[in-house]
Design a protein with these regions (language model features):
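Patatin-like phospholipase
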Residues: 1-165
Length: 165
């Protein structure tokens, strides 16, 4: 139920397992094993690893968000909780982590907004409504992609200035 930060620079097979684990979304992908330990997407426990970046002593932090300013996650409904409990009955800590993810995310966003306001971090986020994870409409996807492209061109100079201060 806790986030771990794995790395690998020698064993390509282990690296692939880590990549598989990092993209193992609940109910959509199987639990992945790395070194005999079951893992799922670390974003469940640490959606935006801002505290980790600060603990590591990074003095320049760039946060790329996928949601609009002011977005907050809502708590999952009871039926969803029951579904997770059934699917992951062997992993009660995972279920607990999934069900409290919104509170952790919202706390992280509060910290990010504070640090951004203080000029301590650089944040890039969409300014238009996002597309859903399951979006298939090419025009909507293209529109959102182009927004990101234009936004980055607009923010690029500010990013360079932040990184070079």
């Amino acid at each position: 139920g806790a986030a771990e930060y794995l790395s690998e620079d020698k064993d390509p097979e282990r690296l692939m397992k880590i990549c598989r684990a990092s993209s193992s979304m609940p109910l959509a992908a199987p639990i992945a094993n790395v070194d005999g330990i079951p893992y799922m997407d670390g974003g469940l426990a640490d959606s935006i690893p801002i505290e980790y970046a600060l603990e590591k002593g990074n003095d320049k932090i760039v946060v790329v968000l996928t949601r609009n300013p002011g977005y907050r996650k809502k708590r999952a409904v009871k039926a969803t909780e029951q579904l997770y409990k059934r699917a992951y009955k062997k992993y009660p800590n995972l279920v607990r982590t999934i069900m409290t993810r919104n509170a952790v995310y919202n706390k992280q966003m509060k910290l990010i907004e504070k640090l951004e306001e203080e000029g301590k971090i650089f944040v890039i986020r969409p300014l238009i409504p996002t597309v859903s994870r399951m979006e298939k409409d090419y025009d909507k996807l293209q529109h959102f992609y182009m927004h990101g492209n234009r936004l980055m061109k607009k923010e690029y100079q500010g990013l360079l200035e932040y990184l070079n201060e």
